[in-house]
């Protein structure tokens, strides 16, 4: 018989830097999960993505066991990494902080495609372009 699902916890954690400190400790502790076991597994699976924020969806079962699914990093983080900037513009439609080429946009869209609500790369590119615009980043051909 399948295990009974008790909770699904979604967190965005730095890759390879999960510790039992907040926000991870309290989020998992209230469900009785072994926090250190999660941290070790998460850090092992995300060691190759150092410096990125990797969202994770943790399914917690009745017997206090858990499974987790890693998602792709947020589009804004990928855009900032591609441009080498710290943050987006504080006034996105007035002050521009950089420009993204079509090739960079396609690369980010292909990386995000599994987690986006899009069926092809073109639609994913439009979604990423919208995120870029709201960050004060222009998209150039």
UniProtKB/Swiss-Prot annotation:
Cross-referenced InterPro entries: Ribosomal_uL11 (IPR000911), Ribosomal_uL11_bac-typ (IPR006519), Ribosomal_uL11_C (IPR020783), Ribosomal_uL11_C_sf (IPR036769), Ribosomal_uL11_CS (IPR020785), Ribosomal_uL11_N (IPR020784), Ribosomal_uL11_N_sf (IPR036796)
GO terms, biological process: translation
Protein's name according to its UniProt entry: Large ribosomal subunit protein uL11
Question: Post-translation: what modifications?
Answer: One or more lysine residues are methylated.
SUPFAM superfamilies noted in UniProt: Ribosomal L11/L12e N-terminal domain, Ribosomal protein L11, C-terminal domain
Domain of life, per lineage: Bacteria
One GO MF term on file is:
structural constituent of ribosome
Role this protein plays = Forms part of the ribosomal stalk which helps the ribosome interact with GTP-bound translation factors.
Name which cysteines form disulfide bonds.
none
A GO-annotated cellular component: cytosolic large ribosomal subunit
Give the UniProt family note: Belongs to the universal ribosomal protein uL11 family.
In the UniProt record, what gene is named as encoding this protein?
rplK
């Amino acid at each position: 018989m399948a295990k009974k699902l008790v909770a699904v916890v979604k967190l965005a954690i730095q890759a390879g830097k999960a510790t039992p400190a907040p926000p991870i400790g309290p989020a998992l502790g209230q469900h009785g999960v072994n926090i250190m076991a999660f941290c070790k597994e998460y850090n092992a699976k995300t060691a190759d993505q150092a410096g990125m924020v990797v969202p994770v969806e943790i399914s917690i079962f009745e017997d206090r066991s858990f499974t987790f699914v890693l998602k792709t990093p947020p589009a804004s983080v990928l855009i900032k990494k591609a441009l080498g900037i710290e943050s987006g513009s504080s006034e996105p439609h007035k002050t521009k902080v950089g420009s993204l080429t079509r090739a960079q946009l396609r690369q980010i869209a292909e990386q995000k495609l599994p987690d986006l609500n899009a069926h092809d790369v073109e639609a994913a590119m439009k979604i990423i372009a919208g995120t870029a615009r709201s960050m004060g980043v222009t998209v150039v051909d």
